[in-house]
From Swiss-Prot:
A cellular component annotation (GO) from this entry: cytoplasm
Top EC class for this record: transferase
Naturally occurring in which organism (per UniProt): Psychrobacter sp. (strain PRwf-1)
Entry keywords, A to Z: Cytoplasm, Queuosine biosynthesis, S-adenosyl-L-methionine, Transferase
Gene3D superfamilies: QueA-like
HAMAP family hit by this protein: QueA
Protein name: S-adenosylmethionine:tRNA ribosyltransferase-isomerase
Subunit record text: Monomer.
EC number: 2.4.99.17
Main location: cytoplasm
Length: 390
């Protein structure tokens, strides 16, 4: 499966909140730092997906955080019949490969995105290549143009045919996805400080992923808490579900390297909002019910679609393309009413996003509470249910 990096009919979203970028000259990244004891990082999943804890922050004004400590299994009682939950149905590729350059030096490759865009499949001489992917490459010396890499215990061959920004353009000898599934390793987050194992192959995927949408290098982690039991309880209560797609890139783990977050360049990811999901969202709001985004990836898809397609009534329609939307305090949300998410890394764009949604001071208080109460953090950690700041 290929996803275009860019096509004429596929817009890229705005990288800045349109309502506040011109009025704020400096926002300090240091304001989104916090101290976290290492032992609170969840490096392995719990025995059951829905056994996590759930911190609930009802809608409230800034700096008035009211915090409820719940269990994730309580989620159905915190929502109402007629509400709509929106999931990301992407699947994580076994995108990490290890091997050698033809010179013998060790190399690690992370496949970021498969592409059939001629911008990347044709070199400067006009020669065309098959099975092309944009990849991150780690090696003592970067591979040179035309250099061959042998990966996956000698079972995968590719050649470096170009560069695109910080990515290497590699052409593989054989179709990429089957080889990744057989010889690749699931690219679990770097803060796990370990290699992926058989447990990760199951638990770092959602139970509802679409197997045809095998294109992410990280999981939509808020969705990892859902098991069949919770999904049935939600359905039995009359809570509706819908799906969008965002193929998560390695940029989700990229640190903000500027002191002023307004100078940060957001990574771009392919996203798709189907018309059926847009219709359900519009109908839900028309009925006076709430739209709940399951994770920051869903939030980015829906708010991008709102910027691109909303009419005078706030109704959205189908949209697909690359989104580099950067959500931070001051952003005006147009679609989501509630957000289910995990606890995020210090100084991360995801922490800035939840601060925009629930209020920066409220999130600070919530994270202080989470540390004090020994919540589990990050991808395999506990969850928060946030309601939009009043």
């Amino acid at each position: 499966m290929t996803q275009p990096l860019s096509q004429d009919q596929h817009d890229s979203s705005s990288n800045m909140p349109t309502d506040n970028a011109e009025t704020q000259g400096y926002l300090s990244v240091a304001d989104y730092d916090y101290d976290l004891p290492d032992e609170y990082i969840a490096r392995y999943p719990l025995a059951e997906r829905s056994a996590s804890r759930l911190m609930y922050l009802p809608a409230q004004k800034e700096n008035t955080a009211v915090i409820q400590d719940r269990q994730f299994s309580d989620l159905p009682e915190l929502l109402q019949a007629g509400d709509l939950i929106v999931f990301n149905d992407t699947k994580v590729m076994k995108a990490r490969l290890f091997g050698q350059k033809d010179t013998g030096g060790k190399v690690e490759v992370l496949v970021e995105r498969l592409t059939d865009d001629t911008e990347f499949t044709t070199d400067e001489s006009g020669q065309s290549f098959d099975n092309v992917a944009l990849c991150h490459v780690r090696a003592s010396k970067a591979p040179k143009l035309g250099q061959r890499l042998v990966l996956g215990d000698g079972n995968i061959e590719c050649v470096m045919i170009g560069r695109h920004e910080n990515l290497f353009i590699l052409s593989f000898k054989n179709p990429i996805l089957p080889d990744l599934e057989q010889y690749g390793e699931l690219p679990i987050p770097p803060y796990f400080e370990r290699h992926a194992d058989e447990t990760d192959n199951v638990r770092y995927q959602t139970v509802f992923h679409d197997p045809t949408k095998l294109a992410s290098v990280a999981a939509p982690t808020a969705s990892l808490h859902f098991d069949d039991k919770v999904l049935k309880q939600l359905a039995d209560k009359g809570i509706n579900t819908a799906y969008v797609t965002l193929h998560v890139g390695a940029g989700t783990f990229a640190p903000v390297k500027t002191d002023n977050l307004l100078n940060h360049t957001m990574h771009s990811e392919y996203a798709n909002l189907p018309q059926a999901t847009a219709d359900l969202i519009n109908q839900t709001h028309q009925n006076g019910n709430k739209v709940i985004a399951i994770g920051t990836t869903v939030t980015r898809v829906l708010e991008t679609a709102y910027q691109k397609t909303a009419d005078e009534h706030g109704h959205i329609s189908t949209w697909s393309g690359d989104t580099d939307i950067f959500i931070y305090p001051g952003f005006k949300f147009g679609v989501i009413d509630k957000l289910l998410t995990n606890f995020h890394l210090p100084k991360s764009t995801l922490l800035m996003l939840v601060s925009a949604f629930a209020g920066k001071a409220n999130i600070e208080q919530a994270y202080e509470h989470a540390v004090a109460q020994k919540y589990r953090f990050f991808s395999y950690g506990d969850a928060m249910l946030l309601e939009r700041n009043l």
